[in-house]
């Protein structure tokens, strides 16, 4: 009986310690500070160009616009180039680089422009290429042909 009581007490103590460790780890991860990255590309809109949490940067959808909001002229190629340049601006402002990008979502107004977009994308993004999804969107803000969002992770 004494051994059983001791075993149950030991088990309870171990569980309590493990629970405290789990709660502590969860609190540390949830209490990480969020740092907003705001460039001219947001132009007063109700979102940040990026949010850094810990060693991860979440880049909001970027389009191929200049600081005044004007789309790059010349079709999907120049617009893709300008979009990727805007992503690089957000990355740089947060202390990240294209090599830190691990995931990308591409929104195209016309999926038939996929091959032309891909040529530019392939020439700009370093190897290994990030995971990527490409989606056709019915319409994009500013009548853009492309919008790209990204997630970057800085190696510790």
Question: What feature does the model see in each segment?
Answer:
Residues 8-85, 89-102, 108-156:
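N-terminal presequence-like segments and the immediate start of the first folded domain
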């Amino acid at each position: 009986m004494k051994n059983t009581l001791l075993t149950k007490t030991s088990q309870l103590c171990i569980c309590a310690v493990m629970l405290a460790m789990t709660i502590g780890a969860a609190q540390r991860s949830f209490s990480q500070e969020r740092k907003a990255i705001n460039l001219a590309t947001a132009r007063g809109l109700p979102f940040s160009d990026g949010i850094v949490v810990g060693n991860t940067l979440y880049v909001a959808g970027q389009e191929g616009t200049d600081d005044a909001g004007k789309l790059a002229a010349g079709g999907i190629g120049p617009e893709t180039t300008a979009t990727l340049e805007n992503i690089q601006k957000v990355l740089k402002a947060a202390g990240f680089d294209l090599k830190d990008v691990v995931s990308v979502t591409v929104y195209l107004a016309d999926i038939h422009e996929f091959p032309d977009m891909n040529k530019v994308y392939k020439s700009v993004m370093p190897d290994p290429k990030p995971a990527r999804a490409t989606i056709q969107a019915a319409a994009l803000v500013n009548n853009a042909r492309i919008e790209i969002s990204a997630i970057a992770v800085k190696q510790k």
